Design a protein with these regions (language model features):
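Membrane-embedded beta-barrel scaffold of Gram-negative outer-membrane proteins
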Residues: 295-316, 445, 467, 489-559, ...
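Gram-negative outer-membrane beta-barrel transporters
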Residues: 413, 513-521, 540-636
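Short acidic/polar hinge/loop motifs at secondary-structure boundaries
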Residues: 113-139
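N-terminal periplasmic accessory domains that precede
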Residues: 79-82, 97, 121-122, 136, ...
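Conserved C-terminal beta-signal and adjacent last beta-strands/turns
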Residues: 11, 185, 230-234, 596-713
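Extracytoplasmic beta-strand/coil segments of soluble accessory domains associated
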Residues: 79-115, 132
Length: 713
């Protein structure tokens, strides 16, 4: 019933743009709005909407749809693969990536509107096909950005008015991959629309746990859908609606040749080959956004209502999980978020542009967990018998987030701009807190081709509510799942001071280079780990944290040649775990209480780059990743273990692509592509199964050959 009500709500939300003009009767008349007028008005409103937000003083990187299409794989890859080409983006297992030493500090926005966090771990909610352009805003962020501090991914969606038509694509190849997809956009009178969808299946849904190209039990089926519709009411107003869906099923991959090591017996069975384990996880996300934009002279305002439903279900192997882990946990979580966001900009004069906004979000979190465990003797700790018992934990919780900001973009001199403001955030969930955060950024352009930025931001980042657990530890006393540590302090919001200094230099009209540096000092630094069989990340706090680093970037554009390169170095450390302690060993907690350790997602050296060349209808492309490796535990000769004290070996991955447009062969709209992923077939570890909050070993993808055919119409 929950899901049915939500689906009806999203459907109604999608239909609203069509109903509004009828209700307003005379507001919009397609006979008096020629197509060209609508297109020009849409372009004007897009430009005005972009003025609501400012990136003054922040580090901003832009990837447009042409750049995505030009890379190996094009828009057939998942979103995380596109984002790995952002400076200082370190890849991790489960499709995660970490920007500037932050575990999960990313906030997605669609046309400037916040998309609340979801529960999904492996699944990618947003397909790259919806992107007209993607802005990654990092560093010292202006006051309109909050709640997440590592980076803002603001996606400008395709609309259909500026580039009508569509495509149908069939893509597939290695690892049993097959992915049909489509997109279509157009206009009719004052209405414009864009839709896209795909169905992905392959046998490498999650990273291989043993480095093989054919991991056991690793099939995935995924559906992604997205739709955008807008109604231009008049030259100053428009209503737009967005709906999206991601539905993904994953098999949890198995290791080969393993046997249970706990010495347990379940219903008379004590052996269980790891090849026979059968764990599965399903992740579903649905969202809808309805927006009204008004632009008149110096004033532009956009107000939106939004809803997001996210569910995750894990089905264990009932016997195998008990034998290997001492617990078989059937878990279901659902988080529904409702929100209101309103942002406005007013150009007071040539020197001052004022911006202000508010954001409200209400979440409900429902959790059903049924854990099968074995009872143990309270004195010996040994199982009483081999008969599983069930522990049921159902819970309902809620969260409220309230935010507001005001800021002024002040052009002090022709070559100097200051953006300063205040932001207030308050949240109330498993814990509560609030903060008034000052922000100030400067941009100095001493020469036409030189831009320097300097900024300070105070950040307040609540823990991801949808991931916070609510286990009652006492229920697991005298069972095979009893934690060694019984302390479970609530996760708190991270508070930090952030400093950023950078420079960008246009060497020529074709070549641009940049340098950026940053330093973050945090209290109650939020990190996440994967504990137990359900692949659900759990947040926890380090009492103290520091993150700092440097970035070098370069890009070159001339004719049909485009090239870029990024190099980053970072250090991310934390001390004293002060929440969710029951997930850790007592020895681990004791060491971290007295020592700063590297965060498990720190990668000290990260590099990426790519190039593409268009020649007579054929595009040749290549990109690469290089990393010094994420952290792992260090085992000393005397037997002492240092959490996250080592890092995995350096790795590189090189990808190639060739795409040809058959226009000159008389086949209008037909293109074909060949992509080679991991050209050199490098076998490299992303995780080795050790480290704070690290789950199973996982490896990067082995060499894969993929083919695609696209017909435009």
């Amino acid at each position: 019933m929950r899901r049915s009500r939500f689906t009806l709500a999203v459907t109604a939300l999608f239909l609203l743009p069509a109903a509004i003009p009828a209700a307003l009767a005379q507001v919009s008349d397609s006979s008096s709005n020629p197509m060209q007028t609508v297109v020009v008005t849409a372009q004007h409103l897009n430009q005005e909407r972009s003025q609501i937000q400012t990136q003054v003083g922040a580090s901003t990187y832009t990837i447009d749809s042409a750049a995505i299409d030009a890379a190996p794989g094009g828009d057939n890859v998942l979103m995380n693969q596109v984002m790995l080409q952002i400076p200082d983006a370190a890849q991790d297992s489960f499709g995660q990536l970490h920007i500037r030493g932050d575990h999960n500090g990313l906030q997605f926005r669609l046309n400037g509107i916040i998309l609340p966090d979801g529960i999904s771990v492996f699944g990618q909610t947003l397909p790259p096909r919806l992107i007209e352009s993607m802005q990654m805003v990092m560093g010292s962020l202006p006051a309109q950005y909050g709640l997440r501090s590592a980076g803002i991914i603001d996606l400008t969606t395709k609309s259909g008015s500026l580039d009508p038509g569509g495509t149908v694509t069939l893509y597939g190849g290695s690892h049993g991959e097959l992915e049909p997809s489509f997109d279509y956009g157009g206009s009719s009178g004052p209405y414009t629309y864009f839709v896209t969808g795909d169905f992905l299946r392959n046998d490498l849904g999650i990273e291989s746990p043993d480095g093989s190209s054919d991991p056991l039990h690793d099939h995935t089926k995924q559906h992604h859908g997205f739709a955008y519709a807008e109604d231009v009411l008049d030259e100053n107003d428009r209503v737009s609606a967005i709906v999206g869906l991601s539905d993904a099923d994953f098999q949890i991959p198995d290791l080969r040749g393993e046997q249970p090591a706990l010495g347990l017996t379940v219903n008379g069975q004590s052996s269980y080959p790891s090849e026979f384990l059968n764990e599965n996880q399903r992740e579903v996300t649905q969202f809808g956004i309805l927006s009204l934009q008004h632009s008149n002279g110096p004033l532009t305002v956009q107000t939106s209502v939004l809803v997001r439903n996210s569910t995750l279900g894990f089905i264990p192997d009932p016997i195998g999980d008990l034998l290997y882990n001492g617990i078989a946990q059937n878990a279901f979580k659902q988080d529904v978020a409702y929100g209101i966001q309103s942002d406005g900009a007013y150009k007071l004069n040539d020197e001052h542009t004022l911006r202000t906004g508010v954001y409200f979000q209400y979440d409900t979190l429902h959790s059903d967990i049924d854990s099968a465990v074995l009872a143990t003797d309270p004195f010996t700790g040994l199982p009483v018998n081999g008969m599983p018992i069930s522990i049921v934990q159902d819970s309902d919780n809620s969260q409220i987030i309230e935010s507001g900001y005001v800021q002024d973009e002040w052009h002090l001199l022709k070559v100097l701009t200051m953006n300063y403001g205040l932001r207030y955030d308050h949240y109330n969930a498993f814990s509560s807190g609030s903060q008034l955060s000052p922000r100030v950024n400067f941009v100095y352009q001493p020469f036409t081709d030189t831009t320097v930025h300097l900024g300070y931001s105070r950040y307040f980042s609540p823990p991801p509510f949808e991931l916070v657990g609510s286990e009652a530890l006492s229920q697991f006393a005298n069972t095979t799942a009893a934690p060694a540590v019984l302390k479970d302090d609530p996760v708190k919001a991270e508070r930090s001071n952030y400093y950023d200094l950078g420079v960008e230099q246009n060497i020529s009209k074709h070549l641009t280079v940049g340098f950026d540096s940053y330093f973050k000092q945090a209290t109650d630094l939020v990190d996440e780990g994967q504990f137990g069989a359900p692949i659900i990340l759990t947040p926890f706090n380090y009492a103290h944290g520091q993150v700092y680093g440097f970035e070098w970037t370069g890009s070159y554009h001339e004719g049909g040649l485009t090239a870029y390169a990024n190099l980053a170095s970072q250090r991310a450390i934390g001390k004293d775990i002060v929440s969710s302690q029951f997930n850790f060993d007592a020895e681990e907690l004791a060491y971290i209480a007295d020592h700063y350790i590297h965060l498990d997602h720190e990668q000290q050296i990260t590099a990426s780059g790519g190039l593409s060349y268009l020649w007579k209808g054929t595009r040749f492309s290549s990109d690469f990743l290089l990393g010094s490796g994420l952290r792992s535990d260090l085992n000393l000769p005397d037997g002492e273990n240092i959490p996250n004290g080592a890092h995995l070996p350096y790795y590189t991955q090189v990808n190639l692509g060739i795409e040809h447009d058959f226009e000159h062969q008389g086949l209008s709209g037909l293109t074909a592509r060949i992509d080679m992923i991991n050209l050199l077939d490098k076998i490299y570890e992303i995780r080795n199964g050790t480290g704070v909050g690290v789950g199973a070993p996982q490896y990067g993808p082995r060499r894969g050959l993929f083919f695609g055919v696209t017909q435009a119409f």
